[in-house]
Amino acid sequence: AAQKRPSQRSKYLASASTMDHARHGFLPRHRDTGILDSLGRFFGSDRGAPKRGSGKDGHHAARTTHYGSLPQKAQGHRPQDENPVVHFFKNIVTPRTPPPSQGKGRGLSLSRFSWGAEGQKPGFGYGGRASDYKSAHKGLKGHDAQGTLSKIFKLGGRDSRSGSPMARR
């Protein structure tokens, strides 16, 4: 029984990442859609349940630790392609996630809901968070980007997570 359990567990993990890999690997379009779909379902349920979708959380293990998990997942599956891409999206897309995602129906309600839910300006769109609002007006674009990035990772992991793949679509 002891031997069966780890093998079963690794099998489960492998199957999970294999599915991911298949989704990642087929076409770039397919890969993004797969990620988006899983993340969309992820966030949809997350929004509905304040417990942060713990059920799916275990499966993806990417919700709370999404910062480490996203690059890790990428490294495991597509080291050359996904990693820089993820990195790029983290640095570039995250700060300006809300505007592009507002064009997508789901992204709109999603980003507005989650940003607004944290007590910031829901309709602001660009930064949403109060400090981003200030720094954006100060014109510190680069700093704002970094601030938004770390803030998102720290405060609203779900925002950056929803944002980056959203913007990828």
Curated annotation (Swiss-Prot):
Phosphoserine found at: 7, 10, 17, 38, 54, 114, 160, 164
Sites bearing Phosphotyrosine, chain numbering: 12, 67
Residue numbers of N6-acetyllysine PTMs: 121
Protein name listed in UniProt: Myelin basic protein
Signal sequence interval, chain numbering: none
Species per Swiss-Prot/TrEMBL record: Bos taurus
Gene behind the chain: MBP
Subunit and partners: Homodimer; self-associates in the presence of lysolipid.
Keyword Flavoprotein in record: no
Function recorded in the entry: Is, with PLP, the most abundant protein component of the myelin membrane in the CNS. Has a role in both the formation and stabilization of this compact multilayer arrangement of bilayers. Each splice variant and charge isomer may have a specialized function in the assembly of an optimized, biochemically functional myelin membrane.
Any GO BP annotation: myelination
Keyword field: Acetylation, Autoimmune encephalomyelitis, Cell membrane, Citrullination, Membrane, Methylation, Phosphoprotein
Bilayer topology annotation: Peripheral membrane protein
Principal location class: membrane
PROSITE patterns: MYELIN_MBP
Region called Disordered, residue ranges: 1-114, 133-169
Modification after translation: At least 6 charge isomers; C1 (the most cationic and least modified form), C2, C3, C4, C5 and C6 (the least cationic form); are produced as a result of optional post-translational modifications, such as phosphorylation of serine or threonine residues, deamidation of glutamine or asparagine residues, citrullination and methylation of arginine residues. Phosphorylated by TAOK2, VRK2, MAPK11, MAPK12, MAPK14 and MINK1.
